[in-house]
């Protein structure tokens, strides 16, 4: 694919233009740097749908901002998520979603531990939808009335999550594994922290983090590069170019003080969540990419539905088919989690430990490593199938200063020794924890 990427043709506000390419995948995307500091990623695809993602490197773990004299100012837990919800409120009190619907476009948003993203998709008139998205995210409106209303909505959401055995088992696990890191707190915050949020706090955090230099715009579909650049010129003032990257500096989290916790929930069956904490410092850039790939392969080798542990537990009736596992990592945190339903969670936990010990004695399987590395590679390639997947993939890598195609080289260069080292480092009983959500009636009857 050929992109027009002459700085002169793209306008005076584009200070650099690069084409990221992957010959193996026959994929490429254009990466532009706007004078405001905004990174603009464009993948031109002859597809019926256009998808755009406007993201900010600001998530639930970013609870400290620089105050007067650069003294850290603590903000309540849940502000990033609260702010995301409030961005949909227009100045007249209406909802921006109505404007997108009028264009025939869909709009959505989400907040994670370390980023917030706003997305749109449409089959026609992408310029109008993109302009609307840029306006919505860069022109906030926070007032006491809308903030008060939002507090009620989010507090109700928190109460609903408190009744979910899966949500509670997972959240209690994080509180047990991390004593100080903000990842231990729910992305939505808690009732006490939500009540502390004010319009002033929201404006302060928006001004601090929602600056173009801390944001990425990713667009995929049958689009024109020049039209996207012109919209950015129109909606993103260059005079607000500042360095707004979160100054994330988390203290080294101490070792876990306890390895078991349980909580009562209104459910029919116990839900367990096993955590495996990585106590080493979390790298950044391409080293973080490598660690992510290695742990993804390792967790698939050990805990996927094709692995011995899942099948033996299921055949013996110790777990139900509802089962999930995954890895999560970011600045200052890294862990693997395994979740499911079981009448006897403690027995499942013992079997888990026995299983890891047997793998340690025999050594991980190189055959399993090669198979799961191929699967990881194939899954990444498949992610370039739809405009939504492509736009989100480009954003997720670019916001960490990476090209999406860096992952291909990372997977190819990963060795069996990398996985064995990770296994030996993480798979120790001191790193394990078990959180159980027990049905209320069951615990009361014990």
Q: Language-model features: where?
A:
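N- or domain-start disorder-to-order transition segments that initiate the globular core
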Residues: 3-51
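Charge-rich, well-structured scaffold segments of protease-associated domains
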Residues: 3-11, 86, 90, 95-246, ...
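Short acidic-hydrophobic surface loop/beta-edge motif
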Residues: 30-36, 253-254, 261-265
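Short, surface-exposed, low-complexity cationic segments
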Residues: 48-60
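Short pre-active-site segment immediately N-terminal to the catalytic Zn-binding motif
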Residues: 59-77
């Amino acid at each position: 694919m050929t992109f027009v990427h002459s700085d002169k043709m793209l306008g005076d506000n584009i200070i650099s233009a690069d084409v990221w390419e992957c010959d193996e995948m026959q994929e490429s995307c254009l990466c532009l740097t706007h004078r405001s500091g905004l990174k603009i990623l464009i993948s031109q695809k002859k597809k019926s749908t256009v998808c755009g993602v406007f993201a900010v490197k600001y998530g639930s773990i970013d609870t400290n901002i620089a105050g007067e004299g650069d003294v850290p100012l603590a903000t309540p837990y849940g502000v990033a998520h609260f702010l995301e919800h409030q961005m949909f409120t227009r100045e007249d009190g209406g909802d921006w979603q109505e404007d997108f619907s009028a264009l025939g476009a869909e709009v959505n948003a989400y907040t994670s531990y370390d980023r917030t993203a706003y997305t749109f998709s449409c089959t026609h008139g992408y310029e109008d939808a993109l302009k609307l998205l840029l306006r919505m995210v860069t022109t906030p409106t926070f007032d006491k009335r809308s903030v008060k209303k939002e507090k009620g909505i989010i507090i109700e959401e928190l109460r609903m999550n408190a009744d979910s055995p899966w949500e509670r088992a997972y959240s209690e696990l994080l509180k047990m594994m991390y004593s100080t890191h903000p990842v231990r707190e729910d992305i939505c915050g808690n009732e006490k922290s939500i009540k502390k949020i004010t319009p002033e706090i929201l404006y302060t955090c928006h001004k601090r983090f929602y600056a173009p230099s801390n944001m990425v715009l990713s667009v995929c579909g049958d689009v024109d590069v020049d039209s996207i650049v012109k919209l950015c010129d129109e909606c993103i003032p260059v005079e607000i170019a500042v360095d707004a990257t979160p100054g994330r500096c988390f203290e080294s989290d101490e070792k876990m003080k306890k390895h078991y916790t349980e909580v009562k929930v209104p459910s029919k069956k116990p839900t367990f969540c096993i955590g495996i904490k990585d106590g080493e410092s979390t790298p950044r850039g391409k080293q973080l990419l490598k660690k992510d790939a290695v742990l993804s392969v390792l967790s698939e080798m050990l805990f996927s539905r094709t692995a011995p542990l899942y099948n033996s537990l299921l055949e013996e009736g110790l777990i139900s088919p509802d089962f999930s596992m995954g890895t999560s990592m970011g600045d200052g945190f890294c862990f693997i989690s395994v979740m499911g339903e079981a009448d006897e969670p403690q027995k499942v936990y013992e079997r888990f430990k026995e299983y890891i010990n047997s793998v340690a004695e025999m050594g991980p399987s190189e055959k399993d490593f090669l198979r799961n590395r191929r699967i990881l590679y194939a899954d990444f390639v498949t992610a370039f199938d739809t405009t939504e997947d492509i736009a989100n993939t480009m954003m997720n890598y670019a916001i960490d200063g990476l090209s999406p195609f860096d992952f291909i080289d990372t997977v190819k260069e990963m060795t069996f020794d990398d996985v064995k080292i990770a296994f030996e480092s993480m798979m120790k009983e001191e790193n394990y924890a078990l959180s159980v959500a027990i049905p209320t009636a069951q615990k009361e009857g014990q």
